[in-house]
Amino acid sequence: MSTQSPTSTNNNISNIANQCNKRIAMVCASNQNRSLEAHHLFVKNGFKNIRSFGTSAHCKLPGPSIHQPNIFSFGTPYQEIYTSLKNQDQELYIRNGLLNMLERNISVKLAPEKWQEEQQSKFEIVYTFDQRVYDAVIEDLLQRDVSSSLLQPVHIINLQVKDTHEEAVGGAQHALEITSIIEKTLNWEEKLDQILEDFYKQTSRQFLHTLMFY
């Protein structure tokens, strides 16, 4: 039985990315860890129409203690957040991986964005990485004006991912794999539930899926 080499697999994903014109959003709570890991991975593999967002009231990152989180407003540049944490306690934030995470974020885009504030862009697929975020995205879409005759479908897919650096990597990889399957599937929208069911059987990654129009 033949197996694909990593180079062959990477080439396949790159080919899929080059052909993909879907607008895809990655959403987590603070647009810092899980959504940015996925955003970074997709861009790294050649996908073009990728955005990422958070749904919380503000961006919360671990601080000196569980009772002292670092709070930043959406729109605060990642470079500014990086400098703030580095000046606060460089050793701590190197040790817990926050500075490394922020270096990645800086390479992807300028600043964290809030999902509820993006009213212009339309997406065909929205990946969320926590059920509370999934619920927040759905609640937001339900509150939007749907009187237009130009409503478009959006598939919201939640992959349940713990908010750790390690889990974020796995969640991003699974989102990439699902997208690759979607791109190779004719009439994918009709078959998406089965695609996700099959993926769950293979990976045990819990998921939720709903179709909305906006």
Curated annotation (Swiss-Prot):
Keywords (A to Z) from UniProt: Hydrolase, mRNA processing, Nucleus, Protein phosphatase
| Main subcellular location of this protein, as a coarse class | nucleus
Q: Which Pfam families match?
A: Ssu72 (PF04722)
Residues annotated as coiled-coil are: none
Q: Which InterPro entries match?
A: RNA_pol_II_suA (IPR006811)
Q: Which reaction does it catalyse?
A: O-phospho-L-seryl-[protein] + H2O = L-seryl-[protein] + phosphate; O-phospho-L-threonyl-[protein] + H2O = L-threonyl-[protein] + phosphate
Localization in the cell: Nucleus
Query: What's the Enzyme Commission number for this chain?
Result: 3.1.3.16
Q: Does the keyword Cell inner membrane apply?
A: no
**What GO biological process terms are annotated to this protein in UniProt?**
mRNA processing; termination of RNA polymerase II transcription
The record's listing under Gene3D superfamilies reads:
3.40.50.2300
Q: Name one GO molecular function term.
A: RNA polymerase II CTD heptapeptide repeat phosphatase activity
Q: Name one GO cellular component term.
A: mRNA cleavage and polyadenylation specificity factor complex
What does this protein's UniProt record list under function? May be involved in the C-terminal domain of RNA polymerase II dephosphorylation, RNA processing and termination.
PANTHER family noted in UniProt: RNA POLYMERASE II SUBUNIT A C-TERMINAL DOMAIN PHOSPHATASE
- To which protein family does this belong? Belongs to the SSU72 phosphatase family.
Q: What is this protein called?
A: RNA polymerase II subunit A C-terminal domain phosphatase SSU72
Name its species. Dictyostelium discoideum
